[in-house]
Each structure stands twice: as structure tokens, then as C-alpha cells.
A protein has these predicted regions:
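Generic beta-strand/beta-sheet core signal
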Residues: 14, 63-65, 77, 118, ...
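Short solvent-exposed loop/turn micro-motifs enriched in small/polar/acidic residues
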Residues: 55, 123-126, 166, 199
Length: 265
């Protein structure tokens, strides 16, 4: 845009409940106020500690526990100058409110395994035992248990998660840190009504589709500590330099695994 330059503007999004959420609207509203006004400075420091550890890694392995079959390896970008660069963005309510996540764009090559969640709501649709299989960072198989017939399960995912694409890449890996939001959802049993701005902060989550930096990968972004976030591209988004039609999917769907379904790698 000639007149409104992307590198010179930003935005902020926040969500609040409406009375239709139920009889406990006032209580829920007060708790959402609390979620949306948590101490950003505190979360910045806590999340920076997490990022400092992740920046020393080559990959992250996420495993489910109990009935959760998740076993996913997420390949990380390599830092050329750790003193000035970082892999993860420290998200502390300067754009998306509330506070509570660190996220990155994974390297697709080497990202592989199974993502499974027993129940999740995506764009107001429920998925039971959603399972996605990845190889080289792209979906190779998928299923759920919403319907008796497997072809109906696959069509449900194809229509509403893959958005009619044969495959999608893992565009984002994030760790949600907002335990206050997690407890609130459980307390009022409103996990299905939580907007993605809040829901994505309640556990580790994975987005299939475009990265968080789509169409703005060349704009340098920095964490509060001054380090440049270098993980803004993956092997598919880099195709924009030759053919933008091959680089973007026009979708980005966050899938959150609840804390109670996560084990130790």
C-alpha cells in the first residue's frame, strides 16, 4: 500500500464475552477482564526464560500422555548470531490480547510425527479425536471420530481444516502460557466458546496453513529484548520470491492441546 505502509503500522485485538454466554455472564466477564489485564511485564520475563532455553535447541519434541497419541518433532531454525537473533516471538499483549505465548515458524524439513487431540473446537466446529500426521512439515494423513464413516470424517477435515487443499504445512508452533485463561475455561465449562485469541494461549498449539508473518516476511521484527526474530519463513513461504501463488494458502488454523494431555518427551 503506497499510503499505509505495513512496517509503520500495527493493530491490537481483544475479545470479551456477551450475555448470551450464559447465566454466569457477570462472573465470566469479570474473569475475562482479569485474563485480558494480566501483568504483561511479568509474562515477558517468564516467556523470555522459555525462549532462552528454546533458542539453544535444534528441535522440540511434543508428546501426549494417557490416551493422547501426539508425538511430534518440530524442527527449529538455526541462529547465526545468538546475541542478536532469536527463533521465538515473545507475545505479551502488544498485538494480540491477552498475554501468553511464544511462537515460531518451524523449518518444514525434519518436522514430522503425529498431532492428536481428544476434543478441540476450531472456528466453532467440534472435532473428536482429531489426528494429523506430518512428514517434512506437511500433512500426509488425517482423521477424526466425529462420524461413523471414515470418508465423512476425512471430508469434514478436508473442508474445514485443510480448506480444500490436498495438504497444508505446519505454519506455526507455539507454547501458550496463560494458565489463568485455561482455568477459567474449565471453571465455567466454556472452552468451546473461547475465541482463538484466548484459546490459543491455554496450551501448546500448532497452526496449519500460512505462517504468522505471511505477506510481511521481509519486515524485520524484534522482541522486547531487542533481538530480531529470524524465523519468519519456511520452505513454502520462500516460494513467494518466484511465484506467490505457490507460497500462500490463505488459511491459518490453530490447534491447541490441553495441558492435561501433554506428557514428557
Amino acid at each position: 500500500n503506497r499510503y499505509i505502509k505495513g512496517e509503520e503500522r500495527s493493530f491490537t485485538i481483544v475479545a470479551y464475552p456477551v450475555p448470551e454466554i450464559g447465566e454466569r455472564y457477570r462472573e465470566i466477564f469479570d474473569d475475562v477482564i482479569r485474563i485480558n489485564t494480566l501483568d504483561a511485564g511479568l509474562y515477558e520475563r517468564v516467556q523470555q526464560t522459555i525462549i532462552d532455553a528454546l533458542d539453544r535447541g535444534v528441535y522440540v519434541r511434543v508428546k501426549g500422555k494417557g490416551a493422547n497419541q501426539t508425538d511430534l518433532k518440530i524442527q527449529l531454525h538455526e541462529l547465526n548470531d545468538p546475541e542478536k537473533e532469536t527463533i521465538f516471538e515473545n507475545c505479551v499483549a502488544d498485538v494480540n490480547i491477552p498475554v501468553g505465548e511464544v511462537f515460531t515458524s518451524p523449518v518444514l524439513s525434519g518436522t514430522e510425527g503425529v498431532l492428536h487431540v481428544s476434543r478441540v473446537y476450531l472456528n466453532e466446529l467440534q472435532y473428536i479425536d482429531l489426528k494429523l500426521t506430518f512428514a517434512d512439515g506437511k500433512i500426509t494423513d488425517y482423521t477424526c471420530a466425529n462420524f461413523e464413516k471414515e470418508e465423512e470424517n476425512r471430508k469434514y477435515i478436508y473442508d474445514n481444516v485443510l480448506h480444500n487443499h490436498e495438504t497444508l504445512p505446519l505454519g506455526e508452533f507455539a507454547i501458550g502460557t496463560n494458565t489463568t485463561a485455561y482455568v477459567t475455561g474449565k471453571k465455567y465449562q466454556i472452552e468451546d466458546k473461547m475465541p482463538i485469541l484466548i484459546a490459543e494461549k491455554t496450551g501448546p498449539h500448532f497452526a496449519v496453513g500460512d505462517t504468522c508473518y505471511s505477506w510481511s516476511e521481509d519486515i524485520k521484527v524484534y522482541n522486547p529484548n531487542g533481538k530480531e526474530i529470524i524465523a519468519r519463513d519456511n520452505e513454502i513461504s520462500l516460494l513467494r520470491k518466484e511465484d506467490p501463488a505457490k507460497a500462500y494458502f490463505q488459511c491459518h488454523t490453530d490447534i491447541t492441546i490441553p495441558y492435561e494431555e501433554i506428557g514428557r518427551a
